[in-house]
Amino acid sequence: MSLSALESTINSAFDARDGVSTTTKGEIRDAVESALELLDKGEARVAERGTDGTWSVNQWLKKAVLLSFRLNDMSVIPGGPGQASWWDKVPSKFEGWGENRFREAGFRAVPGAIVRRSAFIAKNVVLMPSFVNLGAYVDEATMVDTWSTVGSCAQIGKRVHISGGVGIGGVLEPLQAGPVIIEDDCFIGARSEVAEGVVVRKGAVLAMGVFLGASTKVIDRETGETFVGEVPEYAVVVPGALPGKPMKNGQIGPSTACAVIVKRVDERTRSKTSINELLRD
């Protein structure tokens, strides 16, 4: 089935999703399974970057993921610690894999790394004990460090370092919401959170503990420019706070969190300078 035929079938099935269930067979099930296989192999992805730098979302692939929850019944997933099992609708990406399959895939998956089927992991990725949700895309030579989460449909670029305990938000619903996107060569500091469709542009550095959502203000302290929903290329960002506004009693109100661009670097400087040096003020 061609991509256009897959898209048409999935869009029609999603419009009539109340009639889709675990007993549904035939064209709809085949189309959803084909779409998930394309995602799993990296032959299709939920979001794609255009030549002008804008990202477009393939909503039909998100619909395929959502339809899979209606099509698939709960089942026992063995292999837990202490001979325990899990109970879910989504199998592991690694189900049935042996040495040859892992060698062909070309990435490392440390014990404790969990990847759900339909997530794509590119060559030379290192997965420490972490969680990668369905529909996500993790590109070449990226590190996903311990206890980090890559949410559903999130798009992670090449040579990205996702430090320990980072949360990269996922999105399936609402359909119009875009996924979190971390472009190539970014560094996401430990315990940071990037959610609600924020785009972190190429080469940006987030210090430890930066929290970014769709409404978080990212302020360039040199120019005063404010960004919302996006971190510019090669920006070095630290946690910050905006001063509180006066309350009715005349006292200064509580401050609100923001993120602060403390400097910007070019590609050459970014490639030759350690992260610690960049974050020194």
UniProtKB/Swiss-Prot annotation:
Coiled-coil segments on the chain, per record: none
EC number(s) from the headed UniProt entry: 2.3.1.117
UniProt enzyme class: transferase
One GO location term (cellular component): cytoplasm
Annotated substrate binding sites: 108, 145
CDD domains assigned: LbH_THP_succinylT
Domain of life the protein comes from: Bacteria
Gene Ontology biological-process annotations: diaminopimelate biosynthetic process; lysine biosynthetic process via diaminopimelate
Keyword annotations from UniProtKB, A to Z: Acyltransferase, Amino-acid biosynthesis, Cytoplasm, Diaminopimelate biosynthesis, Lysine biosynthesis, Repeat, Transferase
GO molecular function: 2,3,4,5-tetrahydropyridine-2,6-dicarboxylate N-succinyltransferase activity; nucleotidyltransferase activity
Presence of keyword Disulfide bond: no
This protein's pathway: Amino-acid biosynthesis; L-lysine biosynthesis via DAP pathway; LL-2,6-diaminopimelate from (S)-tetrahydrodipicolinate (succinylase route): step 1/3
Compartment list: Cytoplasm
InterPro entries: DapD_Trfase_Hexpep_rpt_fam, Hexapep, THP_succinylTrfase_dom1, THP_succinylTrfase_N_sf, Trimer_LpxA-like_sf
Keyword Amino-acid biosynthesis: yes
Catalysed transformations (reactions): (S)-2,3,4,5-tetrahydrodipicolinate + succinyl-CoA + H2O = (S)-2-succinylamino-6-oxoheptanedioate + CoA
Entry-linked HAMAP family: DapD (MF_00811)
Subunit structure: Homotrimer.
Family: Belongs to the transferase hexapeptide repeat family.
Protein name: 2,3,4,5-tetrahydropyridine-2,6-dicarboxylate N-succinyltransferase
Source species: Bradyrhizobium sp. (strain BTAi1 / ATCC BAA-1182)
Taxonomy of the source species: Bacteria, Pseudomonadati, Pseudomonadota, Alphaproteobacteria, Hyphomicrobiales
